[in-house]
Amino acid sequence: MSIYVGNLSYSVTQDDLTKVFSEYGSVTRVQLPTDRETGRVRGFGFVEMESSAAEDAAIQALDGAEWMGRVLKVNKARPREEKGARSGGGSWSRNNGGY
């Protein structure tokens, strides 16, 4: 599972995030999406840790904490929704039987 980290400073690096999160356990991966046009960090990232206990400890400690002059928003990442996905489920082409 991944951790979503929001409201990051635009000057943050993967090493910065790794150092902070490694205080709570082993970090296995850090992603910092960048803007296609400018190449600048978009202000959020994702961190994966070795255990869910480490993730929970990091979320508990860092959500709402001030870091690099900003108040962090840290929680479990939700799966990415596919483009064009509609909420509510169901299908318009459902076959509900015949006569």
From Swiss-Prot:
A molecular function (GO) term: RNA binding
Region Disordered, residue ranges: 78-99
Record domain RRM: where: 2-79
Keyword RNA-binding found: yes
PROSITE patterns associated with the record: RRM (PS50102)
Gene3D superfamilies hit by this protein: 3.30.70.330
Entry protein name: Putative RNA-binding protein RbpE
Record gene name: rbpE
